[in-house]
Design a protein with these regions (language model features):
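Short, basic/aromatic beta-hairpin or loop at an interaction surface
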Residues: 22-25
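Structured loops at beta-to-helix junctions and adjacent beta-edge loops in soluble globular domains
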Residues: 34, 130-132, 162-164, 171, ...
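Phosphate/oxyanion-binding loops and surfaces in catalytic or ligand/nucleic-acid-binding neighborhoods
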Residues: 134, 175-178, 229
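Hydrophobic ligand-binding cavity/cleft-lining segments
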Residues: 145-187
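Basic, tryptophan- and glycine-enriched interaction regions
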Residues: 176-203, 208-214
Length: 230
């Protein structure tokens, strides 16, 4: 028998959050743009988890669970002193590993006075965070060094869309619609024919070749011109 809640959504598009958290956590996720995280802590909601991002005294990025274990106040509402982030409620101090190192009202810290910490790496123009098992980190974030290469022009920002984020993810992953819906924009027909796939152990693999195609006028006129960075 299927769970009654699950049964209700069979054959329907499942609203975000209705069946719980099923994000792949043991992988790198973009947490923020590098230039967003400066001297003040910044709050993020990542994978249904409150996270606070900040920088240590030497500029190294850090990430903690954004709740003080005492009264669950958001640490992102506090401030940073040296390498410590200070809770805005009772002034408890936490290091980048999530351990409480000082509480103004008591001399000894209980072992339970700690919160989860997350590995953060700065690569390209982004901060990447590992939200899963911190002992299972077995790879580096994707190589996006071109984002800070002087031979490239990189633009960053946010674009708010009033829609379920799942729809955007599905659209980006679905490349088969490009030749039909965007035929006057991208002029790319490589995805009309399904590529051959093969099994390598437990991994399904395929190879796809793309022909060079000229950009449409709308993309040419809306793309930024190269800048002389010399």
């Amino acid at each position: 028998m299927k769970d009654s809640n699950e049964q209700k959504f069979i054959g329907q598009r499942i609203p975000n959050g209705m069946l719980g958290d099923n994000y792949p956590r043991n992988m790198w996720w973009v947490a923020a743009r590098s230039d967003e995280i400066k001297e003040k802590p910044v709050a993020r909601w990542l994978l249904e988890t409150p996270v606070v991002l900040y920088r240590l005294e030497d500029g190294t990025p850090a990430a903690l669970y954004d709740r003080c274990p005492h009264r669950w106040a958001p640490l992102s509402e506090g401030h940073v002193e040296g390498d410590k982030i200070i809770c805005p409620y009772h002034g408890m101090q936490f290091n980048s590993e999530g351990h409480c190192t000082k509480a103004p009202t008591q001399k000894m810290m209980p072992k339970t006075a700690q919160i989860p910490s997350f590995k953060v790496l700065e690569r390209g123009a982004f901060l990447w965070i590992w939200m899963g098992d911190q002992d299972a980190i077995d790879c580096e974030p994707p190589d996006v060094s071109y984002q800070t290469d002087n031979d490239w022009t990189f633009l960053g920002g946010y674009y708010d869309v009033k829609a379920n984020w799942v729809l955007i993810r599905e659209n980006v992953m679905d490349l088969t619609h490009i030749a039909f819906l965007h035929k006057n924009t991208f002029k790319q027909n490589d995805w009309i024919t399904a590529p051959d796939s093969y099994l390598d152990g437990e991994t399904i693999c395929y190879e796809q070749e793309f022909d060079l195609a000229p950009l449409s006028p709308c993309l040419l006129y809306t793309s930024p011109s190269p800048r002389d960075r010399g």
